[in-house]
């Protein structure tokens, strides 16, 4: 992840043949700077995938896409919502139907609906060779379809938005906002995310990356502790747990070993290893 949290989200998924950006929730300048820190220029991007139209996922989109002619992949509802306030002149839309799959270069992209208070939010599963990456942020609860889509992934990016006690005791958010966040179309708490991960264990999953943390109502320590507790309960000490950060990126994060010759899936993310906590 180039950056992940309540203030903005953008993620780079790369193989040796392909570069895909997920969401544009950082400023256009920050997207460019952080891409270049990963050794990728905007001109090298093969596509920009959107999860939904909320500002923390698209706020940099208009300026970024005005400067760089990058195809935008999303469903029709999300495209229409974005066109209402920006990108009205953008021509390079690649509209998909939620639930379908398609390829970008050598990456198979699977799409599926997620419950969130946006017009038609989606999650993604990326497959290349025999390795898979699941990507779900901004959802209120896990559907059966979502769980099934993620059973074949080896690395999962999942939101751990808030600690329930910190959110309930927060003095800056009015009660209706707290209700929205905790609703079935809001955001996953640490405990709820840990429950999703448990449903994928045992299975192919080897690593989880926790993202979209609230600055005010969560900490990396609380998020990782919740998932670590679940890991110990199901006796999967081998499961790696990382946490994404809002204001930094990480070195290359490898999803798998070298596949099909020189093909090697990588995941650019702002991470720290929980062993250091």
Question: Where in the sequence are the language-model features?
Answer:
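Active-site neighborhood of phospho(di)ester-bond hydrolases with catalytic His/Asp-centered motifs
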Residues: 22-25, 45-53, 73-76, 134-137, ...
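Active-site environment of divalent metal-dependent phosphoester hydrolases
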Residues: 55-58, 79-81, 118-119, 141-144, ...
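Conserved beta-strand hairpin/beta-sheet module of binuclear metal-dependent hydrolase folds
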Residues: 1-38, 122-137, 155
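Active-site metal-binding motif and surrounding structural segment of the metallo-beta-lactamase
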Residues: 29-74
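C-terminal regulatory/interaction regions
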Residues: 221-277
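Cap/insert and terminal regions of metallo-dependent hydrolase folds
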Residues: 144-245
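Metal-dependent catalytic neighborhoods of phosphoester/phosphodiester hydrolases
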Residues: 59-68, 81-84, 218-225
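Metallo-beta-lactamase
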Residues: 76-123, 127-131
């Amino acid at each position: 992840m180039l950056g992940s949290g309540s203030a903005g989200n953008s993620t780079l998924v790369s193989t040796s043949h392909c570069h895909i950006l997920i969401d544009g929730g950082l400023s256009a300048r920050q997207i460019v700077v952080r891409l270049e820190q990963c050794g990728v220029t905007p001109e090298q991007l093969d596509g920009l995938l959107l999860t939904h139209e909320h500002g923390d996922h698209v706020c940099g989109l208009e300026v970024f896409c005005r400067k760089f002619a990058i195809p935008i992949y999303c469903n029709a509802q999300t495209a229409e919502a974005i066109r209402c306030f920006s990108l009205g002149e953008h021509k390079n839309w690649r509209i998909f139907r939620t639930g379908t799959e398609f390829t970008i270069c050598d990456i198979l992209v699977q799409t599926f609906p997620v419950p969130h208070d946006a017009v038609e939010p989606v999650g993604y599963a990326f497959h290349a060779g025999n390795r898979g990456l699941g990507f779900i942020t901004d959802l209120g609860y896990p559907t059966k379809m979502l769980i099934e889509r993620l059973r074949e992934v080896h690395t999962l990016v999942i939101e751990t938005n808030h600690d329930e006690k910190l959110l309930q005791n927060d003095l800056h958010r009015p009660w209706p906002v707290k209700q929205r966040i905790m609703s079935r179309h809001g955001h996953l708490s640490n405990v709820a995310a840990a429950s999703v991960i448990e449903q994928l264990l045992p299975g192919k999953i080897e690593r989880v990356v926790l993202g979209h943390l609230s600055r005010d109502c969560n900490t990396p320590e609380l998020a990782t502790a919740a998932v670590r507790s679940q890991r110990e309960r199901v006796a999967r000490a081998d499961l790696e747990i990382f946490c994404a950060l809002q204001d930094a990126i990480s070195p290359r994060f490898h999803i798998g070993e070298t596949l099909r010759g020189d093909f090697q899936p990588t995941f650019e993310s702002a991470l720290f290893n929980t062993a250091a906590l």
